[in-house]
Regions:
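N-terminal, positively charged/glycine-rich alpha-helical extensions of SAM-dependent methyltransferases
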Residues: 1-35
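Class I SAM-dependent methyltransferase Rossmann-like catalytic core
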Residues: 32-47
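Conserved alpha-helix/loop element of class I SAM-dependent methyltransferases that forms part
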Residues: 45-65, 82
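Class I SAM-dependent methyltransferase SAM/SAH-binding core
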Residues: 70, 76-123
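A conserved beta-strand element that flanks and buttresses the S-adenosyl-L-methionine
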Residues: 135
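Short catalytic micro-motifs in class I SAM-dependent methyltransferases
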Residues: 138-142
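A short glycine-rich, Lys/Arg-flanked "PGG" loop and its adjoining helix->strand segment in the class I
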Residues: 150-157
């Protein structure tokens, strides 16, 4: 993962704003719009899985059992569960989550073989090319600062 000099004061401000956004969302977590028992939510999840399968095929990642994946912003671990369902092996999965409570939820839901790293993704110190895939799903929709988005994208690349 590439490095770029980081202005820690700007980073801290945006990181705190992300934390506050997720705090506000907690109140809505049990809203019907998130329930997989709602057919439209369930169909959306299925479409996401179909898109993931298409991407795996187009990126020529199959077979996936030996692919190493890092997910930035793993939340409660739903994407990692989906990857395992498609054949990715837990010992080859690593997750990063900024928010402590979400990282703990992921730890409780996911197999112990999955490494979960708590904290800011910009602070990750992982060897170059230690992953076949660096994945994020909705991280950039939670970060509104363009410069911070750029730094994170560079880090992931």
């Amino acid at each position: 993962m590439a490095e770029r000099p980081v202005d820690r004061s700007e980073e801290a401000g945006e990181t705190e704003r992300v934390r506050l956004r997720y705090e506000r969302r907690k109140a809505d977590i049990n809203a019907p719009i998130y329930s997989p028992l709602d057919p439209s939510v369930y169909m959306g999840q299925q479409e996401k899985e179909r898109a993931l399968i298409r991407w795996i095929q187009q990126a020529d990642l199959a077979p996936v059992h030996d692919r190493r994946v890092l997910e930035i912003g793993c939340g409660s671990g739903g994407n990692l569960l989906q990857l395992m369902k498609l054949g990715f092996v837990p010992k080859n999965l690593t997750a990063n989550e900024l928010l402590e409570d979400r990282a703990e939820l992921a730890r409780n839901l996911l197999p112990s073989a999955i490494r979960i790293i708590k904290g800011n993704a910009l602070d990750l110190d992982l060897p170059e090319e230690s992953f076949d895939v660096v994945h994020q799903s909705t991280v950039f929709s939670s970060i509104l600062d363009d410069e911070f988005q750029g730094k994170l994208a560079d880090k992931m690349w």
